Amino acid sequence: MGQSTSAAGNSILNRRRSKSFTLKFPIESIESEISQPDYTSSLPDECLALVFQFLNSGNRKRCALVCRRWMIVEGQNRYRLSLHARSDLITSIPSLFSRFDSVTKLSLKCDRRSVSIGDEALVKISLRCRNLKRLKLRACRELTDVGMAAFAENCKDLKIFSCGSCDFGAKGVKAVLDHCSNLEELSIKRLRGFTDIAPEMIGPGVAASSLKSICLKELYNGQCFGPVIVGAKNLKSLKLFRCSGDWDLLLQEMSGKDHGVVEIHLERMQVSDVALSAISYCSSLESLHLVKTPECTNFGLAAIAEKCKRLRKLHIDGWKANLIGDEGLVAVAKFCSQLQELVLIGVNPTTLSLGMLAAKCLNLERLALCGCDTFGDPELSCIAAKCPALRKLCIKNCPISDVGIENLANGCPGLTKVKIKKCKGVLGGCADWLRTVRPMLSVNADTMEQEHEEAASNDVVGGSQENGIEFPQLNSQIMASSIASSSRNRSGYFKSGIGLFSGMSLVPCTSRQRRASR
């Protein structure tokens, strides 16, 4: 009897469950939604690809899982690809580049603890990416000169080549220069294998006419690239970071031909006034960075200012050497009337040079001073009274006080942003007062309490970025134009709206919209 009662109860319960399930999820409704047409099927592949270009990488991957057509369209229209270049990547190359057969920008990065791809993998990639325009290699230590030579022969349309922390040598870079006639940008960082190479072994090759930008960083024998720098007929940008050796003679040889260089960046380089005097013959120079070059003095800066009258952007990190000061800055003010951005770190200007800069450089919009022991309230008051075009001002670790801030509030009518950091004489209440007096002014200032907290954190981290100052780049044609990436041209409004569709099916949405209209 107990068993029969239990069976009867279970049957009743099952009928109730099935009834409730039928009421909540009618089968007819599910079938009607499935039978609705896919309105995206009439959308041309070109339009679908255009929609994909507004999505980030994660959303594009999700869209590729919707159906086979979307996966094909997404793969055929992906031009930028970044891969972990571990050794096991070689097994995935055929399938990977069969799907992404239109890649023009490729980044191969490997971490320090893994074994990177070798020559065989790089050659396979080059055979499947004949139209490659940009290649970036990071920590691919298994690559050799042989692999780079084979790659250069297969990808002759390369425009941008960047490599860092790799172990191939000068012959690999030379192969790229000898085969890629359209090469515009060359960036070499932390490469080994240059110790026994004579400088004449690396020339510009077929890239002599196309090369526009050269960046060398942390190279033991970077002078090997001297013929490349001198032989680049249309060089516009030269950046040298922490490369050993004396560079005065090389810069003299480069400037003698004056190819129209508009940007030079020298950081922790062994250069002197001899090099600066040579750079002064680059009459088209618009941007100059002198960062921790202790042998450069007022004489070299004055020589550049006198002949480079188009200078618009000047960054000087004097490294507290006190070799660049009022004399050099007065020359800049006298001859460089188009100056728009000035950054002084470890330099000691006074009202003499600052007053001249304010009076002569009427287009000065961005000014930053860091660790300037002579920049006090009189200097700040001078800037406030004489710089009507100034828009952005950054002061860090300078002996200013609340008096200077009060004078700043009454001057610089075009000022939109002020940043004050580690200035012990400025109290937090003064910054709040400045926000009240100038409500349209963006004020970024630390209080005394925040200053002590930052000092403690810098002691833990090491304070390596104590003097870091950033400004947006000028709207000039300093760098050679590269192929525009689809991700750079996204519309922010459309991107935020299309993000709502990530992770959901578009077909049921269209069917529900049609049913609602009925």
Swiss-Prot record:
Domain F-box, chain residue ranges per copy: 37-82
SMART domains, sorted: LRR_CC (SM00367)
MF annotations from Gene Ontology: ubiquitin-protein transferase activity
Gene3D superfamilies to which the protein is assigned, alphabetical: 1.20.1280.50, Ribonuclease Inhibitor
InterPro entries in alphabetical order: F-box_dom, Leu-rich_rpt, Leu-rich_rpt_Cys-con_subtyp, LRR_dom_sf
CDD domains, alphabetized: F-box_AtTIR1-like
Protein's recorded name: F-box protein At1g47056
Origin species: Arabidopsis thaliana
Taxonomic classification: Eukaryota, Viridiplantae, Streptophyta, Embryophyta, Tracheophyta
